[in-house]
Design a protein with these regions (language model features):
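Class I S-adenosyl-L-methionine-dependent methyltransferase catalytic core
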Residues: 1-181
């Protein structure tokens, strides 16, 4: 797994190959990340953004956003393997001044006192309803109009307080783009 574009283009990230079912890690494939970031770039959603990466895993989506011009990323990951990989990648990219790792369950992180987030990546374990619960938990962390990129194994219906923006299917992955209203 590598950074696709931007200042860290081509830099390999610490990862788990095609995944680690025991650690519930399922990295988003390069071709899906390329298509996703093309969608976000065309909307002007990355440059200068404050990014929240929920169920961050390796942090690949957040690091890709930083590489392409986001101002900061907060990674939320409760698994030890994912936390170690994110910490390793922060060190590898010398990105500690632009990143923060919250070691908590994305559905129960409590209040946030920092800047509101403009862009959210959310790739929960498929089919467990965790995406809906995480959005409810962090809704007040988000700026009005914030974009949420939700990866699941089916198209998702936006919960109350969010509006649909776009949906795409890549193999077994469905990307649902919604905005906070």
């Amino acid at each position: 797994m590598r950074i696709i574009a931007g200042r860290w283009r081509g830099v390999p990230l610490a990862g788990v190959g095609k995944g680690d079912p025991g650690a519930h890690l399922r990295p988003t494939p390069d071709r899906v990340r390329e298509a996703l970031f093309s969608m976000l770039t065309s909307r002007g959603a990355i440059e200068g953004a404050h990014v929240l990466d929920l169920f961050a895993g390796t942090g690949a989506l957040g690091f890709e956003a930083l590489s392409r011009g986001a101002d900061s990323v907060v990674f939320v990951e409760n698994g030890r393997v994912g936390q170690r990989l994110i910490t390793d990648n922060i060190a590898k990219l010398d990105a500690s001044d632009q990143t923060r790792l919250l070691r908590c369950d994305a559905t129960r992180c409590g209040p946030w006192s920092g800047a509101p987030f403009d862009l959210v990546f959310m790739d929960p374990p498929y089919g467990k309803g965790l995406g809906e619960r995480a959005l409810a938990a962090v809704r007040d962390w988000l700026a009005p109009g914030a974009l949420v990129v939700w990866e699941e194994n089916a198209s998702m219906i936006p919960p109350e307080g969010f509006a649909p923006v776009d949906q795409r299917k890549f193999g077994t992955s469905h990307i649902t783009l919604i905005a906070r209203v």
